[in-house]
Curated annotation (Swiss-Prot):
Pfam families: BES1_N. Residues 6-89 are annotated as: Required for DNA-binding. The gene is BEH4. One of its GO terms (molecular function) is DNA-binding transcription factor activity. Belongs to the BZR/LAT61 family. It comes from the Eukaryota. Keywords: DNA-binding, Phosphoprotein, Transcription, Transcription regulation. Coiled coil: none annotated. Residues 1-21, 304-325 are annotated as: Disordered. This is BES1/BZR1 homolog protein 4.
Length: 325
């Protein structure tokens, strides 16, 4: 069984076995009746083929040792029946008749279509190779001359100089029979069309032509996004510097959507009403403000400074016994 066929299911296999058992049972009963009531001279312990031969001899048929069967009074057929082709030599006494005609229509002409671009048409054209008038004239003459050979086909189905049968393998001299070669001249390709025809990839961005951006002017104020407005221009500076930057005019935003942090300064909240409140403008107690000198730096709470109070010599390694601590 080839790999392209479908495997039968379990139920289908069971049905096939059941039908085969029934056929064998019927055939066994038929041959049993022929053996019992046929009065044939059969050899001892013979198979069913001998019973079938005796039945054919009684009915007027001759069965050769190789299985060739034909009627009495007729000569043995010269050629045996071809199972695949379905054709055999015609015999007046044979039990089978050959097919009167083939199942396909023979091609009246060649299987190649004539076109003005073909090499065989070069001698039919005139001096002007671009003109189609000589080709149309030759097409009409070809169709009229071959109409008699295709009388079995309707006029609207006939293809002049062609075939409606299966395609024929081209000869070795034909360009279509050769292996197609890959074009290695990559310099002649149009890169702009090659890039635009490629589907976009998450890991590769297509850079369009520079002419697309020739007439585009980037605005100074761009709609704010959370990634730009979370970090101020001077995140660890004083409040006065942020206020002076806001009063001096609106800041310009860099066109770097992939960057964040201090590389892309944010618009102060005074210039952009939709922006989030920066860290320096947030309302917080003065003792927790970073860099403020009013109350000093934030002191550590109890238990934070562990390594500063005890030296390395005072530490003692124990096994967890409370009495040795």
């Amino acid at each position: 069984m080839t790999s392209g066929t479908r495997m039968p299911t379990w139920r289908e296999r069971e049905n096939n076995k059941r039908r085969e058992r029934r056929r064998r049972a019927i055939a066994a009963k038929i041959f049993t009746g022929l053996r019992m009531y046929g009065n044939y001279e059969l050899p001892k312990h013979c198979d069913n083929n001998e019973v079938l031969k005796a039945l054919c001899n009684e009915a007027g048929w001759i069965v050769e040792p190789d299985g060739t069967t034909y009627r009495k009074g007729c000569s043995r057929p010269v050629e045996r029946m071809e199972i695949g082709g379905g054709s055999a030599t015609a015999s007046p006494c044979s039990s089978y008749q050959p097919s009167p005609c083939a199942s396909y229509n023979p091609s009246p002409g060649s299987s190649n279509f004539m076109s003005p671009a073909s090499s065989s048409f070069a001698n039919l054209t005139s001096g002007d190779g671009q003109s189609l008038i000589p080709w149309l004239k030759h097409l009409s003459t070809t169709s009229s001359s071959s109409a008699s050979s295709s009388s079995r086909l309707p006029n609207y189905l006939y293809i002049p100089g062609g075939s409606i049968s299966a395609p024929v393998t081209p000869p070795l001299s034909s360009p279509t029979a050769r292996t197609p070669r890959m074009n290695t001249d990559w310099q002649q390709l149009n890169n702009s069309f090659f890039v635009s025809s490629t589907p976009p990839s998450p890991t590769r961005q297509i850079i369009p032509d520079s002419e697309w951006f020739s007439g585009i002017q980037l605005a100074q104020s761009v709609p704010a996004s959370p990634t730009f407005s979370l970090v101020s221009q001077n995140p660890f500076g004083f409040k006065e510097e942020a206020a002076s930057a806001a009063g001096g005019g609106g800041g310009s935003r860099m066109w770097t959507p992939g960057q964040s942090g201090t590389c892309s300064p944010a618009i102060p909240p005074g210039a952009d009403q939709t922006a989030d409140v920066p860290m320096s403008e947030a309302v917080a107690p003065p003792e927790f403000a970073f860099g403020s000198n009013t109350n000093g730096l934030v002191k550590a709470w109890e238990g934070e400074r562990i390594h500063e109070e005890s030296g390395s010599d005072d530490l003692e390694l124990t096994l967890g016994n409370s009495s040795t601590r």
